[in-house]
Amino acid sequence: MHFRKKYEEKLALSSLRKRINRMALTDQKLRYARAQADSKEERQRVSHEIHVADSLNRVEVKAILRQYGWPGISDIGKDGQNNFWLLAQHADDDPEFQQAALAAMQKLKKTGEINLDNYAFLYDRVQYNLNYRQWYGTQVNWTAHGKANGFRPIADEAGVDRSRIACIQGVIDVLNFAAR
């Protein structure tokens, strides 16, 4: 308990972190419930609940993005930043918003304030939602039961590992600078 309080005191926006983490917890509980559903009807019911939750979360995430830009790790912690990304990632009904979120995230790409894996995932999600091929190979097709079933189209399958390495180069540069 003491450690968590000390950690939260170091964050610039700890109350925002809590708000984001609550939304993400609901998001994940619903998706888990859908994956565990025993019938088509139950999956459809939970899918509707997910759609409603995603819509409400998107309104909140848009407001946060307008007020703060993309909150970094020093603002809301690694968990908060990962969960903020998750909520943007699940805003598939609004690819224009996802593009705006990606642009805000892009500004922090070389600062160490974001998880670059999340950047790659959101980049590919935006590409897919705009009917383009993904670059980093992060997006997969899903079965009705929530099982991964092969990659969605990749722009350069032979070079996808190079793309992934290039994405994390910013982290390597930051670490090398910090080590000096």
Where is each model-derived feature located?
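A cross-kingdom marker for long, charged
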Residues: 137, 141-180
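Preference for long, solvent-exposed alpha-helical segments and helix-linker "stalks"
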Residues: 1-81, 90-92, 109-113, 122
